From Swiss-Prot:
Its EC number is 2.7.8.7. GO terms for biological process: 10-formyltetrahydrofolate catabolic process; lysine biosynthetic process via aminoadipic acid; pantothenate metabolic process; protein maturation. Belongs to the P-Pant transferase superfamily. AcpS family. Its main location: cytoplasm. Its cofactor is Mg(2+). It is an enzyme of class 2 (transferase). It is found in: Cytoplasm, Cytosol. CoA binds at residues 47, 86-91, 108-111, 181-185. This is L-aminoadipate-semialdehyde dehydrogenase-phosphopantetheinyl transferase. The gene is AASDHPPT. The lineage of its organism: Eukaryota, Metazoa, Chordata, Craniata, Vertebrata.
Amino acid sequence: MVFPAKRFCLVPSMEGVRWAFSCGTWLPSRAEWLLAVRSIQPEEKERIGQFVFARDAKAAMAGRLMIRKLVAEKLNIPWNHIRLQRTAKGKPVLAKDSSNPYPNFNFNISHQGDYAVLAAEPELQVGIDIMKTSFPGRGSIPEFFHIMKRKFTNKEWETIRSFKDEWTQLDMFYRNWALKESFIKAIGVGLGFELQRLEFDLSPLNLDIGQVYKETRLFLDGEEEKEWAFEESKIDEHHFVAVALRKPDGSRHQDVPSQDDSKPTQRQFTILNFNDLMSSAVPMTPEDPSFWDCFCFTEEIPIRNGTKS
């Protein structure tokens, strides 16, 4: 008797992904910009075309290209078959009818300062935020802290103000902010969440550039949230990145690090260039020269917030 051959579906192996793209140093040529816009969905082209500042348009474009690169290369879905949607809160997600071997596949992007960043996990809930340390546009640092007083708990402010140097205090402020935003983005609640419900116990206080640390602990309404873990890193001297991780059902996952793990991990951010972003791209729409003309009329945001050199 001859039995029919079994058909096996090869599921691509996927680990966590951490990517960053330097929007601040990217000066797209006409050919690059027109190729990029041909490689995203029409509704996203329209959205990006509405930005007043080139800085915002570049960051949004980089974010869309990173997402499509992720889905194409990690899920093996052809670039021109990828359908991205947005939730009611505006979060980009893969369309539910997509051929996805990972039912809990999760990704998140953030852009601020000079970078757009992406974190993705095959099984874990994930949120990411990046913050650039910069001086307040108006007023002194103490005045800025007074305005933001209700965003942090008393203990968090004690940690921030424990440093004598105001620049270091500002550094710690943005590190705390990135952590809170990463959690809020992971749970998808958007604006309206009371930030003082969250309290982060930072550890270590000093982070080395290029390393990833997983010691910081989260307390929600005074109770430690052990099912959550946070990866912290500095891409460069001025940019903090926080990645919030949790298994979707709330239980601990073997890939969610314990707060007792005091050693930096090797899940560092890979810095991509434009050629990396486009390595799997397939143009989906005709070339539109007017989109370049409109981009040329946008301006970079005036730099009112200085950074310490």
